[in-house]
Every structure is written in C-alpha cells, then in structure tokens.
C-alpha cells in the first residue's frame, strides 16, 4: 500500500499574480506528487470557503494561514494513511475541518492535499492520472470550449456576458479541434484589428474588446470562424457563460445591456439567441438562487440548448440533487475548488450523469500550470472542458496535456465532438 509519509505546502502565485496554495505529498516508496489550487473571479455564494489572510500583505490575499493549516493540522491527520484510499483520506479532511463550507481549514488547503494524494497514488501505481481515476474505459477526449472573447468579471469592458466560447464539434480528433480553435482565435484577432477594436486579453486569454452587446460579439466570432475556413455550426458551434449572478440584484432584477430585466425577459432573450445563432450551451443564464427562473427557462428551451449550472450548483452534490428534483438546468459545470475534495467532485459528476445531466470540466480564472483537470475530464468522460483561450501558458497547459493523453491512448482515443451535445442538433445558421 502506498503510505503517505510527508505532506508539505507553500504559497505560490496564480495567473493573476495572486497567492494560492501548492501541496506536495511524499509516499514511503519515494513517490512525490504536487498539486496547485486555482481561484475564481466570479464566485458562487454557495462555494466552499477559500481561506485568505487579510491584512496588507498581498492586499489581503495571502494564503499563509491555509499553508499553516496543511502543515500543522492536515499533515498529522493524513500521514500514515494509504494514498490509494482517496475516499478515506478525503473523509479525514472533512472530519478534521468540521464545517459545512470548509471555512475552518480552507477549501484551498483541503483541495491541495486531496489532489496531491490522488496524483501520488497514480504515480506510485505507475499509471497516468486519467487512467488511475477513470479505470480501463477512460478514453473520451473532451470538446474544448474555448473562451475567445472575455467580458463580465474577466475583463474591464462594457460587455455583460462573461465568456463567449467556441466549440469545435465537427473536428475528427482533439488534436484537430485544438488546431481549429487556435486558427479561429488568430482569425478573430485579425477581424478585431481590421475593425479598430482592442486585441488586449482578459483573465482567460480571450480578447476583451469593448462591444455594444452580446450579438455583436457573436457576430464577430462568426466572421472569425468563416475567416478560418470553417463552417459556423457544423464545424464550430458557439457557447456562452453569462454569469448572470454578477449583474443580478434581489428585488430589482437583471441589469443587462443597459436594461433592467426579469427572469422571463432574460429567457425571451435567450430564446431569440438560440434561434439566430448555433448555440449549444449557455452557462449560468440566471442568478444562482433564482430557482423558479431556472426551472421555467429549462422547461422553455432546455430541449434545444444545454443549460449549465455553475454558481447554481457549485459542484455540490446536495445542491445538484435539489436542482435535479426541481428540473433546473440540464448540465453541471465541474470546478474542483468549488467543493474542495476530489471525492465530492467525483460524487457530483456521478450524480449528474446518472440523472442524464451533461458535465463540463472547468478551470478558474485564477489558474496555475497544474493540469489535473485535463486528466479528470478524460477520467470521468465529461465530454466537455473549458480552460480558456488557446493562449497564456496556464490555459494551454491543460490543452497540451489532453494532446498527450490522446497520443497515449492511440487508436482507443475517441473525440467527443458533436456527441457531447446529443440532444441538440446544430446546423449552420
């Protein structure tokens, strides 16, 4: 059995220049593995708590308290446990913290240990992480949902929608999908330059031009797809992350595109969009606690487009189960740091799949070079991954890892392609 012998932690920087936690786990057999924890910009109210130091150091965003929690409390609790007993290790972490939202030790401390333990166990077993976690049937490469125009909390512009994504669903392989995405990305840069628009980048590597609204951004992307010699819809579909909680005020409504709108008016807007553009997915179209609005929206357009719960579900099995029972959404966004342990993440994915919900593996806007989510996407067969534009090394690291996995799988590899969205026939519009 691969016994945990050492647990270390340090403060490192993420892609936004803010501190985050990195954990190293050493086993008795000499194996050493490392995991770094991401951090979000638009965070759901119901996410597990990220422990920050406060004070003047790093403008209050230091994580020395979380590092100390790993070294002083977590390490003694897990040393001596088997790294291949992931559920047992994660339960020990939950019991030690003792709070429902991981606010005592911090989800950033707990997750770092949870992921590093899994990576150490995989290395000790001489298995790639995707194979260790997913078993012999893990072979599906996800569609890269590339965020090529950044708005909302990810950019300092007037665009309310947070992410405009392309989904190369018609590609024959992940390798080709990545090429298509990169070519559309470069085509978009040329389109923006020709129109005198900014080619500055947002947090996730996408361009951040100041545009009049959602339709203008989608039109630009459509032009870029055609400029890359691809067909909009059948080759490359479109997707949005609206992050509607960011512009929702309780009692007032949605302050969207210079108007105050109700949930019903937002639903009408989305219905118009999916009629005009080949949209396969809309994430967080309504606020995280607007359950009635979500249920009505799902009833209205859920048979025509994927409706992804991010802030709504926060990768939490309990909130997801509530949503499934209500009929809210039809897909789960998976962010490991929203819930804080690998076991709970896997439980949420399993619950979603058993209920017929799709899953999309996701990065955070504050990322590191850690590639765990790439392996995790293949391990659970999510069929979709979003990890930013094909730019900035913390984003590209995940795409490059998926290239390696596809190569390692060889003839057994299958690219999810348009089957990632089996209920939604997408044609050029």
Curated annotation (Swiss-Prot):
Pfam family, one: Enolase_C
Bridged cysteine pairs (disulfide): none
Amino acids binding Mg(2+): 241, 283, 310
The protein's required cofactors: Mg(2+)
CDD domains: enolase
Active site: 204, 335
UniProt-listed SMART domains: Enolase_C (SM01192), Enolase_N (SM01193)
Pathway connected to this protein: Carbohydrate degradation; glycolysis; pyruvate from D-glyceraldehyde 3-phosphate: step 4/5
Subcellular location(s) of the protein: Cytoplasm; Secreted; Cell surface
EC numbers for this chain: 4.2.1.11
Cofactor note: Binds a second Mg(2+) ion via substrate during catalysis.
Family per similarity comment: Belongs to the enolase family.
Protein name as catalogued: Enolase
Gene that this polypeptide is encoded by: eno
């Amino acid at each position: 059995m691969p016994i945990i012998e050492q647990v270390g932690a340090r403060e490192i920087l993420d892609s936004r220049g803010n501190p985050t936690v990195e954990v190293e786990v050493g086993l008795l057999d000499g194996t050493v593995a490392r995991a770094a924890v991401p951090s979000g910009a638009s965070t759901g109210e119901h996410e597990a708590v990220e422990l920050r130091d406060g004070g003047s150091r790093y403008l209050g965003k230091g994580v020395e308290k979380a590092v100390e929690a790993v070294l002083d409390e977590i390490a003694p609790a897990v040393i001596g446990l088997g790294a291949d007993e992931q559920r047992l290790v994660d339960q020990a972490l939950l019991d030690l913290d003792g709070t429902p939202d991981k606010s005592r030790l911090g989800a950033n401390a707990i997750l770092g240990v949870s992921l590093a333990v899994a990576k150490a166990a995989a290395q000790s077993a001489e298995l790639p992480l995707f194979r260790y976690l997913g078993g012999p049937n893990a072979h599906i490469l996800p569609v890269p949902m590339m965020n090529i125009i950044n708005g909302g909390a990810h950019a300092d512009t007037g665009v309310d929608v947070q992410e405009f994504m392309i989904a190369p669903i018609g590609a024959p392989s992940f390798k080709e999908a990545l090429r298509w995405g990169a070519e559309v990305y470069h085509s978009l840069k040329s389109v923006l330059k020709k129109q005198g628009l900014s080619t500055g980048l947002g947090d996730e590597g996408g361009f951040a031009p100041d545009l009049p609204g959602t339709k203008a951004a989608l039109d630009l992307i459509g032009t870029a797809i055609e400029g890359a010699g691809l067909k909009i819809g059948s080759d490359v579909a479109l997707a949005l992350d609206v992050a509607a909680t960011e512009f929702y005020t309780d009692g007032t409504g949605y302050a969207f595109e210079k108007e105050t709108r109700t949930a019903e008016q937002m639903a009408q807007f989305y219905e118009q969009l999916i009629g005009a553009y080949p949209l396969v997915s809309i994430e967080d179209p309504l606020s995280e606690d607007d359950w009635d609005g979500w249920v009505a929206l799902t009833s209205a357009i859920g048979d025509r487009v994927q409706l992804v719960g991010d802030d709504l579900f926060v990768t939490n099995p309990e909130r997801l189960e509530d949503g499934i029972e209500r009929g809210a959404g039809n897909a789960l966004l998976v962010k490991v740091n929203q819930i804080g342990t690998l076991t709970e993440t896997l439980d949420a994915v399993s619950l979603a799949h058993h209920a017929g919900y799709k899953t999309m593996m996701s990065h955070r806007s504050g990322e590191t070079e850690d590639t765990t989510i790439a392996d995790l996407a293949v391990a659970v067969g999510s069929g979709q991954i979003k990890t930013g534009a094909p730019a900035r090394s913390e984003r590209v690291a995940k795409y490059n890892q998926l290239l390696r996995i596809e190569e390692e799988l060889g003839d057994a590899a299958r690219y999810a392609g348009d089957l990632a969205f089996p209920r939604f026939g997408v044609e050029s519009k």
